[in-house]
């Protein structure tokens, strides 16, 4: 298992193979990830705790509660946020960890 600290919280990568990656993401309250898309990467997330805000390209928001899932296809613009309290999610994806195109970022990352 490998922990990766992020400005919005951290990731615990618990599985990493040539075919898939499994991560647990902890998003601190009041933080959000970049508005982004992936050219190749496909991912499914499962909410463990907290209310996850999922933003799309048009700014629409979907709120997900513990036990709910969300699938992200390649080229689908998305952003995850923890607006009300800290959020923990499980993410299972294809192994393309560096496949991130950031459109907006609260922390100045490109």
Please describe what each predicted stretch is.
Residues 39-55:
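Glycine- and acidic-residue-biased ligand/ion/polar-headgroup-sensing regions
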Residues 1-41:
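A short glycine-rich, His/Asp/Glu-containing loop-to-beta-strand
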Residues 58-77:
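Short acidic-glycine-tyrosine-enriched beta hairpin
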Residues 32, 44, 51, 77, ...:
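Structural motif
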Residues 2-6, 79-110:
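Double-stranded beta-helix
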């Amino acid at each position: 298992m490998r922990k990766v600290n992020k400005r919005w919280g951290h990731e615990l990568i618990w599985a990493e193979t040539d075919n898939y990656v499994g991560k647990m993401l902890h998003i601190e309250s009041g933080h959000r990830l970049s508005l982004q898309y992936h050219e190749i990467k496909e991912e499914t997330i499962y909410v463990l705790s907290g209310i996850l805000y999922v933003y799309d390209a048009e700014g629409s928001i979907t709120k997900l509660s513990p036990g709910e899932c969300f699938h992200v296809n390649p080229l689908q613009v998305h952003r995850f946020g923890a607006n009300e309290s800290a959020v923990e999610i499980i993410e299972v994806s294809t192994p393309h960890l560096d496949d991130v195109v950031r459109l907006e970022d609260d922390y100045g990352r490109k």
